[in-house]
Amino acid sequence: MSALLAHATQCLDTGRPAQAILALQEALRIAPGAAAIHHDLGFLCLQAGRLPEAIAALRSALTLDPSFAQASLCLGIALQGQGDTAGALAAYREAASLQPALTAAHVCLGALLESLGEQTLAIASFRSGAASGPASVWGRLSNARALVAENRDVEAEFVLRELVSLHPANAMGHEMLAMVFANGGRFEEARACYQRAIDAAPQLAGSYYDLTRCRRITRDDEALLSRMRSALVAPGLTADARLKVHLALGKALDDLGEPAAAMQHFDDADALRSSLVRFDTAAFEARVERLIDHFTPDLIARASDGGSSDATAVLIMGLPRSGTTLVEQILSSHPQAHGGGELPFWTVRGARWEEANVNGAKPALDFATLGAEYMGQLHALARQALRVTDKMPLNILWAGLIHLALPRATLIHCRRAGIDIATSIHRTYFNPYVSFPTGGAELVAAIRAVERLTAHWREVLPANRFIEVDYEQLACAPEPAIRRLIAACGLSWDEACLRPEHNPRVIKTPSKWQARQPIHRDAIESWRRYEPWLGPLAALVP
């Protein structure tokens, strides 16, 4: 037995993980009741990307030793890699409960909760992680994650600078510091940090994706392209990580004027995302029909009977990649407005309301209380601002519910050509837990369903509360479009709104680079360069 374990260690130390796995499998035939060996086998399979084998081995370890916190943590990572969100959450929580000092469990739990829109729970988990090991690498990362989630980026930068100073080979620290820089528009510093992260961990897929989105790739970047191609075929890369590398390579090849090769990578990324999360087109279309049927003109007309009287909220909504970040950047350039970013409030409340209705509960909502709860969160972001924005794009699903709770709020619908939206979505990384497709016939159907719902909102919501901004008009003739937008929000005119690229605020959305550029027309009809390779998306071509 000891010889087999020593051989496994030697294989691992010499870069032969497959042989190490074989040695551990042989050891388990001799000692099937050894929980530690099951854990080690699961851990190696996890590193090798062999997730089903990892899950089986880790579950065996936990069956033999239910108090094995590290096995529960690794199980959570493996389950998350396979798209089992509920299983991953349970495993992370169990690991953190079994061993509160296991900081990585708190960080993984917080990161997953954050991706699901559970911001308050995520911050609490990050805070627990930071408290469990404040001087450790994971503790510092956890503290930084909490600070970023609380929009305290300056403090997060200090924590991360200290981390990479103490641990210069820590790729996650460099990657997170790069993200803080990129969110603040400090792209040169971000690029340097992403490069350090890649140097430290050449398979760090997120750094490739974010680095390529911080600048245009040129023919001088052959070394970067070579590294990305190597990372793509490296063993152990999870489906989500491989997805990011495909998108990074697609962006790079797009910049280099190779749209056919770029589109192939975008298609491959979409296929991987589809393997992680299945989009149910029929269920989404049924949801849209239920919303249309429920929010009748008579119901909307009664909005003034309840809800909050607060007019502070400006909700910017529409399909993803329709220009919502640009509109928020314009509005938040006004001295009396504050950009709140993408807030998960209505995603969570809308889903709860919908679930209750579908289950036949038909809850009687207190719209004034609902509106007051939301406004409490909004005012906490900027208590002195006359207007505070919330630019969660798919709040478009809940426009009727929002109007009933906030009848004086301004709802801004960002409208853009469907085919340009589709090709932009197809090129962009979206968290697998965002329930929206990124390609194929599913994306076409989803866009058409949202457009159908939007047409309903256009008919039933008051015209002075549901304002529409056309991306193409905004890009081609910015000043008149911006003046109309500012007036519709009840703000006095300010010239700063014409120069949103100078707005220094933190931007956390995929458009953080584009939103820092002067308003331009380059993205109009951007689909044309992919025309021969559009596939099902061609159905959206006007």
Language-model regions: role of each:
Residues Y208-T212, L225-G236, V245-A313, A368-A382, ...:
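PAPS-dependent sulfotransferases, especially Golgi type II membrane carbohydrate sulfotransferases
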